[in-house]
């Protein structure tokens, strides 16, 4: 029977259209590849059920044990499988040489952690300087092993996605010689888990997009492609609902997140939420280079934020409020400029794909920067997952023929650090915006998760940021209302507890009892400095922002307050001057 005559028959293993007679049985190309790899690699599988799993075109990857058993029952002969032919030398000897290099690398490079991302040792050899740098700094890649986390995960994890991993171009055993490959195809359960995540991420992004579409838009998109429109303030409500659902769906996919203690899950959810949304937005924007060139930020809901808008506009804002927000937005220019220059533009130039974004998501969720918020046992799990993600991405590069995988991998690590930093800067910006009532997120979930205290603790960035802003605001208000006289410099004794938070108080040995402060003097520029009322000398101007009832004690009276009695703030020059 000729090969073409088998096309009308079904595979005796999975019932898919047959490709020919392979190893003694009529089978499809996928089952042919699966059977051959299992025999060559001497793989052993174990069914998690009763060894009666259904093997069909949709579910043939669900249970490898039952699939291999059915191959044998269909008549495939193990003895008919030939070992890989290597024209450059013995495959066995080459593996020994590769193993020797790996052992030398593991002895010379101990695993280190840097910026929250750790590598193990033993990776592909290369003369590239970046590979050597990565190995030296991180200690690269461990040998693959079977993942007990994934193999023991509930069956519901497998049912969400259907992806065939065995459909690769393996030549038929009945015709042309085998195509040689220097790299064995990664096909263990760990790589399958990563491929499932990549597939699920694409489905997840598409489902979020469809949540914003009407059926008219859906039909028009298939005919004319997606149409983008300017973002409207009313879009925020719908966007928040869809993004919350997407966040919970995606984090549930991450193994073994569901098995962690509830306190650790809560902390990781809050820490990851702002990073997940930021990365999704960066990735969505990078898919539209023409909009990026104009400085227009494309969102996942088929809208874009124009260059002359901030994205914080509310439905009832008038033109003056919109202009004011635009002016205030300059405060956040460092953050905006950084993510445009250091994240979105590289995403566009590199044409970052779903697999790389999945890798970044995994690294952000299990980042070492989250260690202080979880238990010791969870920290160990997080390190394992970071190592797992790095190995999986490198295998994915090799499997898909990526040009210069070590260089590409190094670029992704650099992007990871930038995204972490930008998310921290964004959370600090939110604190400033909230202080000046620049935006109100209280009715959305963003403030509960994304801007939770574990994300908005800015003391490690600028301990005096909020304090300085409050002081500046209070003093500016008082100056504008005539409540303060011109300033001269003098020294008064201060209580450090009054001017600093407990976290930033210096040791007593380093504290200077006398510090330079501004003291108002009389309006006559030639008069000597006058002293302040001792009861008010140490009042923090920031207190006035939150205690409006104290303003009459420190501000000049208005014209209609002429008879209003208030305590004297300034004494005459004959009184004692504080120095």
Swiss-Prot record:
Spell out the InterPro entries in the cross-references. Answer: HNF4-like_DBD, NHR-like_dom_sf, Nucl_hrmn_rcpt_lig-bd, Znf_hrmn_rcpt, Znf_NHR/GATA
GO function term, MF aspect, one:
RNA polymerase II cis-regulatory region sequence-specific DNA binding
Quote the Gene3D superfamilies the UniProt record gives.
Erythroid Transcription Factor GATA-1, subunit A (3.30.50.10), Retinoid X Receptor (1.10.565.10)
Write the record's keywords in alphabetical order, separated by commas: DNA-binding, Metal-binding, Nucleus, Receptor, Transcription, Transcription regulation, Zinc, Zinc-finger
Q: Where in the cell is it found?
A: Nucleus
Which segments constitute the NR LBD domain? Answer: 189-452
User: What is the purpose of this protein?
Assistant: Orphan nuclear receptor.
* Name assigned to this protein: Nuclear hormone receptor family member nhr-71
UniProt lineage: Eukaryota, Metazoa, Ecdysozoa, Nematoda, Chromadorea
